[in-house]
UniProtKB/Swiss-Prot annotation:
GO terms for cellular component: cytoplasm; Holliday junction resolvase complex. Residues 256-352 are annotated as: Head domain (RuvB-H). It comes from Chlorobium chlorochromatii (strain CaD3). It catalyses: ATP + H2O = ADP + phosphate + H(+). This is Holliday junction branch migration complex subunit RuvB. Homohexamer. Forms an RuvA(8)-RuvB(12)-Holliday junction (HJ) complex. HJ DNA is sandwiched between 2 RuvA tetramers; dsDNA enters through RuvA and exits via RuvB. An RuvB hexamer assembles on each DNA strand where it exits the tetramer. Each RuvB hexamer is contacted by two RuvA subunits (via domain III) on 2 adjacent RuvB subunits; this complex drives branch migration. In the full resolvosome a probable DNA-RuvA(4)-RuvB(12)-RuvC(2) complex forms which resolves the HJ. The keyword RNA-binding does not apply. Its main location: cytoplasm. SMART domains: AAA (SM00382).
Amino acid sequence: MRIELLNTPPDAAESRFEEQIRPIRMEDFAGQQRLTDNLKVFISAAKMRGDALDHVLLSGPPGLGKTTLAYIIASEMGSSIKATSGPLLDKAGNLAGLLTGLQKGDILFIDEIHRMPPMVEEYLYSAMEDFRIDIMLDSGPSARAVQLRIEPFTLVGATTRSGLLTSPLRARFGINSRFDYYEPELLTRIIIRASSILGIGIEPDAAAEIAGRSRGTPRIANRLLRRARDFAQVDGISTITRTIAMKTLECLEIDEEGLDEMDKKIMDTIVNKFSGGPVGIASLAVSVGEERDTIEEVYEPYLIQAGYLARTTRGRVATRKAFSRFADHTLLGGNFGGHKGSLPLFDESEAD
């Protein structure tokens, strides 16, 4: 049975756990050092001037702490925060209700901001730039627009697909911060801290083993920790040992590099079914039985980071590392992507 660890949003229990372990001060936020150092300067300067912080765009793969940092920004600014997500803002009226309820210096956090409808996005432009919105009263021949001033606020947008933001929206963010994957050593510290909050002990080498297979992502590390706790408790053990950690990871089919069943299926399909590529994302999604957006947002970034996959103008291409691990040479006949022993040179540009 396949257990989803990567492409499932946090459930209620996980959300409560994330709230428990969520730091509330910038100095307690682990990792992303350059990003947080810069934000400290911008926040301090805004507070010294008595201004609202410039609008902030937080981008990067899921599970790296974008939502956590949005709440920390509000805490550091001493401001209230209202949170929503792009898909929920399906009408301009929904956004107008949020904007008119903001007080001076408040934070409006929009997760998945790239999924806002274009009409709603355009409604944000004047709000972000001039702190005003236009509201339509009545309809038909008697319709008229009324301009309302709103209090200066800070929009914090989070996205896993910054390339899908329109240029006008992206240009209105004064602060653009990109999240990177975490190093295993830092994830080990995060796991040890989280285990103490969970109320279960963990051996350092067990924490390190889990960290090394967490794809550089704190959310995945915490999910694996909770599953390891389950195995330990069922076995009547009060501390997660390396043996328990290994048992957990093996049962969940998480390998030494953090690849799960779907990662391997994607790479096996590209290497053996499509002879290494290039293959378009639509064809790949149909072949592996996964949503296109999920492949692009969840699986591809790490496969590229791990050196297995490249995106080119013609499609997805497997790398030499991918062939060395996944190639079935009886199918390929010694050819690498149909190039007789050598991989094509590829660029890093986006493909459809």
